[in-house]
UniProtKB/Swiss-Prot annotation:
GO terms for cellular component: cytosolic large ribosomal subunit. This is Large ribosomal subunit protein bL19. The keyword Ribosomal protein applies. This protein is located at the 30S-50S ribosomal subunit interface and may play a role in the structure and function of the aminoacyl-tRNA binding site. It holds the Pfam family Ribosomal_L19. Keywords: Ribonucleoprotein, Ribosomal protein.
C-alpha cells in the first residue's frame, strides 16, 4: 500500500519544473484564474514566509503588502493551477518560518539580499 502511494506521488511530482527557493526569497507566482469560460494568468509577487515539505502535499506561503494591507496566500507546490514560479531575489534570513514579518511595517519588514 505504501509503495503504491509513493509511486503515485513520484509520478505526479516529476513533470513540474520548480526552482529552488526558500523562506526570505521574493518570488512571482503565475496562477491560472478561470473567469467564466476564459482562463488567464494572475501574478502574485511577494516574500516567501514559510515552506512546508510534505512530498506531494508540499506548500509555501507568500506575503505581500497591497495598498497598505498585508496579503498572504498559501500555494500548493504541485498544484495544476500554478503555471510558473520565478525567483526574483534571494533573501538572507536565519529562520525557516518568517511569521514575525506580520508584525513589522515599512523598512523593518525589509529583508537583506543574499550576496
Amino acid at each position: 500500500m505504501n509503495n503504491i502511494i509513493q509511486l503515485l506521488e513520484t509520478e505526479q511530482t516529476q513533470g513540474k519544473e520548480i526552482p529552488d527557493f526558500r523562506a526570505g526569497d521574493t518570488v512571482t507566482v503565475q496562477v491560472k484564474v478561470k473567469e467564466g469560460n476564459r482562463e488567464r494568468l494572475q501574478a502574485f509577487e511577494g516574500v516567501v514566509i514559510a515552506r512546508r515539505h510534505r512530498g506531494l502535499n508540499s506548500s509555501f506561503t507568500v506575503r505581500k503588502v497591497s495598498h497598505g494591507e498585508g496579503v498572504e496566500r498559501v500555494f500548493q507546490l504541485y498544484s495544476p493551477l500554478i503555471a510558473s514560479i520565478k525567483v526574483n531575489r534571494r533573501g538572507d534570513v536565519r529562520r525557516a518560518k518568517l511569521y514575525y514579518l506580520r508584525n513589522l511595517r515599512g523598512r523593518k519588514a525589509k529583508i537583506k539580499e543574499k550576496i
